[in-house]
Amino acid sequence: MTVRVAINGFGRIGRNVIRALYESGRRAEITVVAINELADAVGMAHLLKYDTSHGRFAWDVRQEREQLFVGDDAIRVLHEQSIDALPWRELGVDVVLDCTGVYGNREHGEAHLAAGAKKVLFSHPGGHDLDATVVYGVNHHELQAEHRIVSNASCTTNCIIPVIKLLDDAYGIESGTVTTIHSAMHDQQVIDAYHPDLRRTRAASQSIIPVDTKLAAGITRIFPQFNDRFEAIAVRVPTINVTAIDLSVTVKKPVKASEVNLLLQKAAQGSFHGIVDYTELPLVSVDFNHDPHSAIVDGTQTRVSGAHLIKTLVWCDNEWGFANRMLDTTLAMAAQGFR
């Protein structure tokens, strides 16, 4: 069965979902029937074809009236401001991928269902009232048919949760801290300009900028046992893609750095193949651009202090890896059937 998908919001994640779908060869499993985006179709086609981070899209892209063509595949383009006006029932939409970054609560999900979609997947963290929050590779097997409004968590949650699970299963985590070193994002300024967050009034290309993060809440959403045992901070750096996460955890069992690396390397080759990767090459952030994994462990940076404090560095392409997980989760939701 081919899953009929609509994309609501055609920004960084929405466009990368399309590119990942075509580049990964999953068009027999997923068909995009519509895209809803307030911007004009000419701009949509141009930004899908030409991307500063990911290069030129190999597929032919063209726009004809209110249709976007990728190769010979026609995708209807919509410009609706209200979810209520979206023709999901008419288009036979199975799953809406809401990539707006704006919507994310149950009310918004219910609006998509009322418009005719069978299920909804948000590309960002949602409220506690959603049916499920999924980190693919860790808890996607818990999806059920009645889970109709789902969050795919965040790119950083998808990056760090698999590593936390591996370390906790092996050594027993007592507590931890996380520092996200994240590329600049659309909510920052090119030059100094007004923003409610005074730090984000400053030019993104000229400073390392501390920002708020809800990553600790994202960790406890997946692993409630870590409530009040993880803290997180985040800084934005003057790069346009790829993120590094510094994870430090105290564990119950004594361990050596070499043992931690062996554990993570084996997981990358085995149970987490395709989700977690492992490297000891002397790489820098740009080398992980367009990497489809949720997490790439940098084994050269693993440290252990006092046998119980583990520090690891984990990379991710915060756009491309996450877009691939959106596709994975879509198929996992569809596999549970539609009511």
Curated annotation (Swiss-Prot):
One Gene Ontology term of the molecular function aspect: NADP binding
Q: Where found?
A: Cytoplasm
Chief location category: cytoplasm
The UniProt annotation places substrate binding at S154, C155, T156, R200, T213, K214, R236
Catalytic function, reaction form: D-erythrose 4-phosphate + NAD(+) + H2O = 4-phospho-D-erythronate + NADH + 2 H(+)
Q: Which InterPro entries match?
A: E4P_DH_bac, GlycerAld/Erythrose_P_DH, GlycerAld_3-P_DH_AS, GlycerAld_3-P_DH_cat, GlycerAld_3-P_DH_NAD(P)-bd, Glyceraldehyde-3-P_DH_1, NAD(P)-bd_dom_sf
Q: Known Pfam families for this protein?
A: Gp_dh_C, Gp_dh_N
**Cytoplasm recorded as keyword:** yes
User: Which of UniProt's keywords are assigned here?
Assistant: Cytoplasm, NAD, Oxidoreductase, Pyridoxine biosynthesis
Q: Report the EC code(s) recorded for this entry.
A: 1.2.1.72
Q: Where is the active site?
A: C155 (nucleophile)
Identify the metabolic or biological route this protein is part of. Answer: Cofactor biosynthesis; pyridoxine 5'-phosphate biosynthesis; pyridoxine 5'-phosphate from D-erythrose 4-phosphate: step 1/5
Q: Which biological processes are named by the entry's GO terms?
A: glucose metabolic process; pyridoxal phosphate biosynthetic process; pyridoxine biosynthetic process
Gene Ontology cellular component terms for the protein in this record: cytoplasm
Q: Which residues does the record give as NAD(+) binding sites?
A: R12, I13, N318
Q: For the site Activates thiol group during catalysis, which positions are given?
A: H182
Q: How does it assemble?
A: Homotetramer.
Family classification: Belongs to the glyceraldehyde-3-phosphate dehydrogenase family. Epd subfamily.
Job of this protein: Catalyzes the NAD-dependent conversion of D-erythrose 4-phosphate to 4-phosphoerythronate.
This protein's name = D-erythrose-4-phosphate dehydrogenase
Organism name: Enterobacter sp. (strain 638)
UniProt gene name: epd
